[in-house]
């Protein structure tokens, strides 16, 4: 009863959060419709082979052959038994709410836990949760299907709450909350978001250090820091399997350093992606105004013709052109929407810079500025280059614009701190109303100037990419077209500027009414919460709305099998690959749902495979398409041996070709090398550059090239005139069995992707695999008849699973200990009373 009396407001807030989360998705959640997300749909194709294997065996495979000719599942479908119980705890935390609904609920609840850890009043904590959770980017990524990113962002505030509790002297609670939500966070499996928020933690810890120095509480600071590190370590260890294998895979993936030394060395980084790739999605400097005005650059890359405000200004003679243009005119390649933190929220943030007096203010300001500067990427290369070259792990991640998630955290946090100061120090408000008016001028005032004279402050409303696309239009049409297009976009921009002014005027009026005792604090907080919710809700509905929801059957039904798929699947051979030339081969996973694909989509594919795509596979695809079309599909007229040897060594048995009317046709490749073959000769080279160059200069059916590090394993292959046979007799994604016979023995090349962790046995005896032709497995086999088994069951998985299980047991003991101590504390308190 006492517990209910103490926490009933918290319970009401949690129920309110659930109601708000449900309400956002009305009527879709009532109708039973679900969100169709591109990335989630793509993931289904990538995971179909894994799901089928699990249904058949009850086991998870760590390898899949469905995309990119084969890759580990560490990043496509990480699943470990050690975190099964943790997953159930996470479901309890989400209250078992449906997908999409619980995403928003977790946003809200996580920030509420953080603000309560800061000891905010409950109504202020609820307000802060709303203005954080409804930041536009958090809804845009739900629409896009970036679900792991959603999870990671939802668990970061409560993880930081553990840090706050520790530095407030609540060591046991700090340890538990840090450990639990670090475990949640790491399991969310989006290292980039976690990494970015470590900058926030860094600045916050500096703020606590400054406080400790001022108050001479060094022992407390050291103890709290130790508690945080211990909690984080425990949460990390609970996810040992996931973290270790993510790290291991990272070295082999596009996130790792290439072994190739390229001519354009300035574009390379010391340990990660290339600079151009890292900064491809960089926020524009002028685009930063979207924090205040969502349509500062037009919003999302959706058809311009769908914007009513713009079309009111459209000249009918240019309608055909406008149907081809998007609303967005920034310099990113494209965007699903802007980063908008709320107009009045931003004003409160600026007000907080004046009236909040704690070191934490400076920590939040520093983190905000850093995130904005880094989000500019290629538009501010001095700082970007410094971080790429000298800050550990920064070069591992692309899409630098997403670092604005830091600002989306720090801005609402300082905004609600400002409100807390206004409420707790009302006399200070009366004496410093000038800061309210200054903040008003820096936000609403600026937005009003933009609205009145947009062209005075922004030089162009047409992107560089659009200028390139329009340059072929005759000059007599181009000039009036550009003038009209500018008018249309100025209208869009001005409308949102006025909207921003309106929101801030209402919010400022509430502060003034509170200043003159016309509103009570609680009432003001509730109205501000409603104002910010309505503001951000309306903006978010532009990018995540009911029109995006479909009947559940549309998403959950198995993709429709085409006639081409049916024909190919009649081939009951155990293992072969398919190259879909009728699709965007390396940007789709639909092919992977039914076939073992040469292509696929994943942002962290194996680096060596990506380099083979760039050097050989992509050029061969173009030549192959042209040759087959020229031959009218008659493969006897296609010189497949010389046109596409790399595709042959990858066991590409079928090509899917495009036909008119969105139809396709399968073409059997008679030149494929099959599952495995003996080679006459292996040439050893000194480095990756020599190896990848040599691949294109030898007869891959009879020769192989390998790095000299594998010479001990592969030895010499002198199999000329060798009568040999290699037959695949058993297939599973993670286990392949071959019968081999040969007169002389030698090196067998398998049409399978090499990756550390694959093991080999010959007649039950361990054998050492080597890597040949830059990406394939190979094995030296003696003459005679043998049985070869290749298996992928890394010992590292078993080791890390043991560590994770023990660590989770420690967490459960910690939970039990705190529960016991709290019970004992309450019991003693009742006895005293």
Language-model region placement:
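Transmembrane-helix motifs of polytopic, lipid-linked glycan transferases
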Residues: 102-119, 345-347, 414, 508
